[in-house]
């Protein structure tokens, strides 16, 4: 079950107790069968055929097949606001310019904004709706969902020139900062409780009532995601406080990693005894690479290299490719004996290793990313539309990275316009970095590089796309002098 009200949970526990008392052998047989099935499924994630860019189109067909053309969104009831699928559609619209993807985005984001899945009073998105038309919400608010949706609403606002999506993104970030962020812990709580009575109140009544309490714990993987989202949105929204918060969270996560106390769960009392899982390390690596891209600090890159080595040593399958979800536990009980490869967290790692390869020029990192994605060639279709991030990761790996570094002041409108222009570029593997301009330098500039070839800086957003198009075309004819094509400013 996705969610059980207290009375249903109590009833289910009573049924379990009765079955254990009266039919224990059957329960043991079922448990053994389940464990054997999981072991068999885990063996399927091994190196498959060669990775092909055509897989991006296959994922596109899967995602489009799940699209709800009546209500927007993907899948049937219960309807989840799946940020990873929206991210993939944003990516496909940016890289193809096809109106069909734009229509899917608008139908989906408008449906969510106008429906009951968005809390228009306090801000933030609920976990899901019981009905396909975005009604009858289940009132829990999840950190990961809201982070991903804030990022994708903001990206869609830029791609589609729809300022209302930007406002929704900002309101969602404001909700997270006011309701889930704990400055004493330097982390976001995992969720806000599903208090249907409170969320059914009018805004006036809510203002006089206590909001539902948040989860008392912070989780390393979702806070790694928070770092990447806040760093990205800080520059797009022109809000320096978001970058400050992101780096404080990253410092907390990485300090635990360096002290060998990195835990999946932490609170103001410190890290718990629950060890970090692979997903936590994957998101830490992604956060370090995002911080390196947004600050140009080499210390984050150095730490990323160290974290990548830990991930390979503890979790990587040297024979079949891909990363296991937990460390090897020969003495583990039950399902803890089974090391599985989870597609979602492996795609996070693959994308981070692609960025690490670009920053270090160490070919080993690219090979690890490729081996990770190849491990799911035979099984990604089983995930349905949830394979969206896999399609995105394949698209990144199979294309050369175009790196756009925007140099400016975070709060400057001209800098934000350049970043928006960069975010509209159609190149599949696009890495937008930022550098704070020197004091007194009031002109924002974009520096564009493809592999080892870089252009003179561009300060006009309208010229950025033309410059990048010229550079990618120039790479097809490497004997021409690029400084004759792009004489600079």
What residue ranges belong to the model's regions?
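"A position-specific structural signal for the A-helix of alpha-solenoid helical repeats
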Residues: 152, 229, 287, 352-355
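Replace the tail clause
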Residues: 1-241, 248, 373-489
């Amino acid at each position: 079950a996705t969610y059980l009200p207290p009375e249903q949970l109590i009833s289910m526990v009573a049924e379990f107790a009765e079955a254990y008392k009266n039919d224990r052998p059957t329960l043991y047989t079922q448990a053994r069968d389940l464990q054997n099935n999981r072991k068999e499924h885990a063996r399927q994630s091994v190196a498959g055929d060669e990775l092909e860019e055509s897989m991006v189109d296959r994922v596109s067909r899967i995602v489009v097949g799940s699209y709800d053309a009546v209500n927007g969104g993907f899948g049937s009831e219960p309807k989840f606001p799946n940020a990873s699928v929206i991210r993939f559609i944003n990516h496909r619209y940016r890289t193809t310019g096809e109106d069909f993807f734009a229509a899917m985005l608008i139908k989906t984001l408008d449906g969510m904004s106008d429906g009951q899945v968005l809390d228009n009073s306090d801000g933030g998105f609920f976990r899901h709706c019981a009905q396909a038309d975005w009604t009858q919400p289940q009132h829990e608010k999840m950190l990961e969902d809201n982070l991903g949706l804030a990022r994708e609403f903001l990206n869609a606002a830029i791609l589609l020139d729809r300022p209302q999506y930007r406002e929704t993104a900002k309101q969602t970030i404001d909700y997270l900062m006011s309701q889930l962020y704990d400055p004493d812990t330097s982390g976001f709580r995992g969720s806000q409780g599903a208090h249907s009575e409170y969320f059914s109140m009018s805004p006036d009544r809510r203002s006089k009532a206590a909001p539902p309490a948040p989860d008392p714990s912070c989780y390393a993987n979702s806070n790694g995601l928070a770092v990447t989202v806040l760093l990205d949105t800080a520059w797009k929204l022109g809000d320096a406080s978001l970058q400050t918060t992101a780096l404080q969270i990253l410092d907390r996560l990485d300090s635990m990693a360096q002290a060998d106390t990195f835990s999946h769960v932490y609170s103001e009392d410190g890290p718990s005894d629950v060890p970090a899982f692979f997903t936590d390390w994957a998101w830490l690596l992604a956060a370090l690479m995002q911080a390196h891209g947004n600050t140009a600090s080499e210390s984050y890159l150095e730490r990323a290299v160290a974290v990548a080595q830990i991930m390979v040593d503890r979790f990587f399958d040297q024979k079949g490719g891909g990363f296991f979800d937990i460390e090897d536990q020969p003495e583990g009980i039950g399902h803890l004996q089974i090391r599985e490869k989870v597609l979602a967290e492996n795609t996070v790692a693959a994308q981070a290793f692609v960025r690490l390869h670009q920053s270090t020029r160490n070919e080993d990192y690219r090979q690890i990313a490729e081996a990770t994605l190849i491990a799911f060639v035979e099984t990604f279709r089983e995930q349905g539309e949830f394979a969206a991030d896999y399609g995105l990761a394949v698209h990144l790996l199979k294309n050369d990275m175009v790196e756009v570094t925007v140099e400016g002041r975070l709060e400057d409108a001209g800098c934000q316009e350049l970043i928006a222009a960069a975010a509209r570029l159609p190149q599949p593997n696009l890495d937008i970095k930022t550098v704070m301009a020197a004091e007194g330098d009031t002109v924002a500039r974009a520096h564009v590089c493809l592999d080892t070839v870089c252009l003179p800086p561009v300060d006009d957003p309208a010229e950025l796309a033309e410059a990048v198009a010229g550079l990618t075309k120039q790479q097809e004819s490497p004997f021409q002098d690029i400084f004759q094509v792009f004489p600079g400013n």
